[in-house]
Curated annotation (Swiss-Prot):
Pathway(s) annotated for this protein in UniProt: Secondary metabolite biosynthesis
Region (SBD1): 62-132
Name the UniProt record assigns to this protein: Acyl-CoA ligase lcsD
Binding-site list for ATP: A107, V108, G109, A110, S111, G112, I113, S114, K115, D216, R235, K331
Source organism, top-level taxon: Eukaryota
Induction: Expression is positively regulated by the leucinostatins biosynthesis cluster-specific transcription regulator lcsF.
Annotated substrate binding sites: T137
Amino acid sequence: MISHRNAIANIMQIVTYESTYQSDEPELCLGVLPQSHIYSLVVVSQASIWRGDGVVVLQGFELEQTLLAIQTNGIKRLWLVPPMLVAITKAPRIVESYDLSSVSVAAVGASGISKDVMATFGELLPACKIIQGYGMTETTGVVCFGNVEDSMDGSCGHLYPGYEARLIDGEGKDVESHNTPGELVLRSPSVVIGYYNDESATSEAMMDGGWLRTGDLVEIRQSEKGHEHVFVVDRVKELIKVRGLQVAPAELESHLILHPAVAEVAVIPVPDDRAGELPKAYIVRASGAELDEQVLRKELSQYVEGQFARHKHLDGGIEFLDSLPKTASGKMQRKTLKEKARTDAEARRQAREKAANGVHKVHVNGVKRPEKMEVFDLSSDDEDDD
């Protein structure tokens, strides 16, 4: 449940934070994100309008249509999600055919982006600075965002004014040192009231004293200027536990997306009797990737194995899909993929069981042998012997 106070608080937090480095002059920004999502609703539709900025609204993200809108209108600020940024970096020839010199800032939220993707984007738009942010519906939008005056690769920036933050370990104790991961817990006037008609979920997320458990594993690191930055490692619940060792899906995804044959990727855990869980990758092939699936599967496995420790290898498999399930804001729906993995595994188990049950035992001269199997029909000579 989001109150008017929550929404107003986050708008004021955004505008106050941006006033430390942004000109008072209104600017034109890109409105390609779905406004039904909290990120676009608060940042684009509310905070930008409150500042007096103009918003060029598009019905959805289509690469060339978006680039044309930027060129035609002289858009200065891009509000994006990572899949859009990746799409731009994967089409350098198309991007270079448009005049994007007006763009000075690309603000990216919803999930992380790799250093290599940022570098490629920087080569295509050298005058544009990328800043990353972090937020969630439960905070009515944004918690922190990068600052062009003090940036760090991979950082989600600094906490917005009005936020209090703590990191806690698995036992609920405070993490008090830099560069040490812990679950982020927050307190702010923008933190929501709770979940509608769901006291159980509300009590699970809300701690005593008005603190919200985000479920995100975070580190606090200091920049060379001495400012503290928020680094999101991964979702606590999405960490894959392989033989007691933790694997962050985002780490594998940020590496796999750099392969030229990969357009999109999501890594999830699949159960394993020996290891507990194993990483599995769902991949959308890039257009023009013509390798046979088996060949590409082997190549991608080796691509990971050459970079990561043994427990991070894709021993759960690689599966190719036409598309990956995402929310309207572009965030990957891992729950849907996990359910698909469970359903597929159950279907394979039932198929094996059905095949086994299709083998009937009969006695022939005191010796048991198969009479019929689902896959193979026994010869008529064998049937005559019966």
